[in-house]
Structures are given as C-alpha cells and as structure tokens.
Amino acid sequence: MLSEETIRVIKSTVPLLKEHGTEITARMYELLFSKYPKTKELFAGASEEQPKKLANAIIAYATYIDRLEELDNAISTIARSHVRRNVKPEHYPLVKECLLQAIEEVLNPGEEVLKAWEEAYDFLAKTLITLEKKLYSQP
C-alpha cells in the first residue's frame, strides 16, 4: 500500500503533469532508447502519440492514486498491451530509472517528489507485473 504522504505528494504533482506530462514522457523515451537500445523493440509499431498516451496514463494514475479502483479497467488494458509487446519484469526498473530522471530534468521537483514517484511507480509496476504474469500463463 502507498503511504498517505506519498499519495498527498503525488496528487500535488497533477497540475505540473498536466502542463509538462508529454515533455516528461518524450524525454523518458529518449533516455530509455539511448541507455537501453534493445527496449526500442518493445515499442515497434507504436504511434508517434505514445508519449502523449503515456503522459495521459501517468496523469490519470496521479489523479486517482487515492482511488485506484477507478483505474482497474485501464490497468488491465495496459497489462494486456504489455503482454502483446512482450514486456517483462526486468524492463520495469529501466523505465523507472528513465522516468525519474526525466521528471527530475523537466520539473526539478526536489527529493520529496522524486521519492514519492519512485514509491508510486514501484507500486504500479508490482501490480502490472502480477497481472502480466497471469496473462502470460494463460494458454
């Protein structure tokens, strides 16, 4: 479970995410593909809209972080998409590293916000990995 403090901090970032979300996610993809070129294969065929789609997902997550049941359908859809693209648990730390670096570069928000986003990312990653494991095991 996420701490109340993390939830408060994440929710406080929603206005900044609405303003700079696509800039953050575009930078995250730049970092990810330059540091870990093999990850580009996971996004083969993804549209140019992918940074905007991810930004919208992050904004929704931050907005509903205190009511995650509101995102159950969206999280299930993301998990199915990840399985189609062959996303594995070992990819999550790479994305986390690049996302946190992008947040730091674009927003320069300070340690409290970065720590909260790290905790929130880990929580969501664990949820997705669990769902994806079930999907991968289905015939």
From Swiss-Prot:
Organism lineage string: Bacteria, Pseudomonadati, Aquificota, Aquificia, Aquificales
GO MF annotation list: heme binding; metal ion binding; oxygen binding; oxygen carrier activity
Family the entry assigns: Belongs to the globin family.
Top-level lineage group: Bacteria
InterPro entries in the record: Globin, Globin-like_sf, Globin/Proto
Keyword Oxidoreductase listed: no
Protein name per Swiss-Prot or TrEMBL: Uncharacterized globin-like protein aq_211
SUPFAM superfamilies documented for this protein: Globin-like
Key words of the record: Heme, Iron, Metal-binding, Oxygen transport, Transport
Domain Globin: 1-133
